[in-house]
Design a protein with these regions (language model features):
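Hydrophobic faces of well-ordered beta-strands that scaffold small-molecule active sites
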Residues: 26-30, 54, 61-63, 150
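Flexible, glycine/charged-enriched surface loops at secondary-structure junctions
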Residues: 29, 64, 70, 89-99, ...
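Glycine-rich phosphate-binding active-site loops on the catalytic face of alpha/beta enzymes
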Residues: 1, 49-73
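C-terminal helical cap(s) of enzyme catalytic domains, especially alpha/beta-barrels
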Residues: 12, 67-90
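Long, charged amphipathic helices and adjacent flexible linkers at domain junctions
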Residues: 21, 79-117
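Catalytic cores of alpha/beta
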Residues: 34-56
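Nucleotide-binding motor/catalytic cores of P-loop/tubulin-like NTPases across gene-expression machines
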Residues: 139, 145-170
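Helical hairpin unit composed of two closely spaced alpha helices linked by a short loop
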Residues: 3-31, 35, 146-147
């Protein structure tokens, strides 16, 4: 899509929000550490892009050319890991994209998922454990972007692979 460059950050945030609201995985992947194809260190702008993707609570970050044909693939992965880990520590809950629960919905799974995530902030809960045959329950829990991990017990390997991209699901 061709858009003026100054609109890209706003459009990215809108698209991330739409994916979260639709309970779809969000992957940010465009030139995250592009300069590390030829240089051992990223630019400050690249570092900020990675941190912002974490602050927006995306499900996954992805490298491409940096690891496919770059001169510093291991360094690129280590760099992204360090930046993401620090951003996870620094993120502020008040900046989260909140998902409202549709009051007119009869979706019991979404209702229970929202309440479970809310409970983690009020009770001494450090994880949410769920079984997940199709992945739907775990994805609902992930969509509400809780502070603590969702431990999904899966019955099918395919479900486990699909959930690997979901925010906070282990």
């Amino acid at each position: 899509i061709e858009v003026p460059q100054e609109r890209i950050p706003g459009i990215q945030r809108v698209l991330i929000r739409k994916c979260i609201l639709a309970k779809k995985p969000v992957i940010v992947a465009t030139q995250m550490l592009h300069t590390m194809i030829n240089n051992p260190r990223p630019t400050r702008a690249e570092v900020t892009d990675i941190a912002n993707a974490i602050y927006y609570r995306t499900d996954a970050l992805m490298l491409s050319g940096e690891t496919a044909y770059g001169k510093y693939p291991v360094e690129a992965v280590k760099t992204m890991t360090k930046i993401a880990a620090q951003a996870e520590k620094d993120k502020l809950e008040e900046n989260d994209i909140r998902i409202p629960l549709d009051e007119n919905s009869n979706d019991v799974t979404a209702f229970l998922a929202k309440q479970a995530v809310k409970a983690t902030s009020k009770l001494k809960i450090r994880a949410i454990i769920t079984d997940s045959y199709s992945g739907r329950t775990a994805r609902n829990l992930a969509a509400f972007r809780g502070k603590y991990p969702v431990l999904a017990i899966c019955y099918k390997e395919k479900t486990m692979r699909h959930l690997a991209l979901s925010y906070g699901v282990e």
